[in-house]
């Protein structure tokens, strides 16, 4: 600290000497003309002298040394900004309903488990369907059956959502048949990451430089992401089932729908 103070004193002295020398030279060169000039200082002359002084190599060196005497660096981090969108999202939605003879339920199950349409779900998830229909055969025939399966996983910035709804009910006019309704949703997604703004500042005696940069944080799953996925699929499901209900009501006013009513 003492060394810095001494250096400042030295360079202030140099700065003062330079001012004095320039003033002396100016006075000597103007002595012969003193009688012809006003005592009031000329502003343009003063500005010119300051400009010449700043261009002096000694003064320039002094300024650079002053800049290097005290430099402060600082880093600040903003609050976290959470995003609600997705970097990528892949949605598979399947909905179907119908009626079938109880004696052909095994064929229906085999179709659901083996058909390429359902390659987007795992074997474990497919077994949920076969177990559900098996449970239905064990209960009272006159009661409806309802099954819902929900799975959510998230790891290394990637998420997966699986939802299945299965409804089976007795046929209203055929005791040997059942009505069934199936809804399957599989969504794979990568949420948009949260981020912070990092500000770095480098300041010396004469100036200050500042830079801002965005730093993305490890991707996390927040409630806003889930709300958006569910809202998107419920909107699609509602629109689809409403259209289906309108179609069915024209052909069979007594037909009910698990999801539409």
Curated annotation (Swiss-Prot):
GO terms for cellular component: extracellular region. Its main location: secreted. Keywords: Glycoprotein, Secreted, Signal. It is found in: Secreted. Residues 1-20 form the signal peptide. Glycans are attached at residues 22, 27. This is Uncharacterized protein L798. It comes from Acanthamoeba polyphaga mimivirus.
């Amino acid at each position: 600290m003492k060394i810095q103070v001494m250096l400042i004193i030295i360079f202030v002295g140099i700065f003062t000497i330079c001012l004095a020398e320039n003033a002396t030279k100016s006075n000597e060169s103007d002595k012969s003309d003193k009688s012809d000039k006003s005592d009031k200082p000329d502003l343009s002359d003063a500005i010119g002298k300051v400009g010449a002084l700043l261009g002096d190599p000694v003064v320039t060196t002094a300024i650079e040394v002053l800049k290097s005497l005290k430099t402060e660096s600082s880093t600040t981090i903003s609050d976290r900004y959470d995003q609600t969108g997705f970097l990528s999202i892949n949605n598979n939605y399947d909905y179907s309903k119908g009626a079938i003879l109880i004696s052909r339920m095994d064929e229906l199950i085999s179709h659901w488990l083996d058909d390429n349409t359902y390659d987007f779900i795992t074997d474990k998830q497919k077994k949920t369907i076969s177990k559900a229909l098996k449970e239905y055969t064990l209960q009272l025939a006159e009661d409806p059956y309802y099954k819902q399966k929900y799975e959510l996983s998230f790891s290394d910035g990637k998420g997966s959502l699986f939802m299945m709804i299965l409804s089976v009910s007795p046929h209203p006019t055929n005791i040997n048949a059942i009505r069934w309704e199936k809804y399957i949703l599989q969504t794979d997604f990568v949420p948009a990451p949260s981020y912070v703004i990092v500000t770095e500042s480098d300041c010396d005696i004469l100036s200050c430089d500042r830079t801002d940069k965005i730093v993305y944080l490890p991707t996390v799953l927040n409630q806003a992401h889930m709300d958006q996925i569910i809202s998107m699929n419920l909107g699609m499901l509602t629109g689809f089932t409403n259209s289906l209900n309108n179609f069915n009501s024209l052909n069979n006013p007594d037909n009910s729908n698990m999801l539409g009513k």
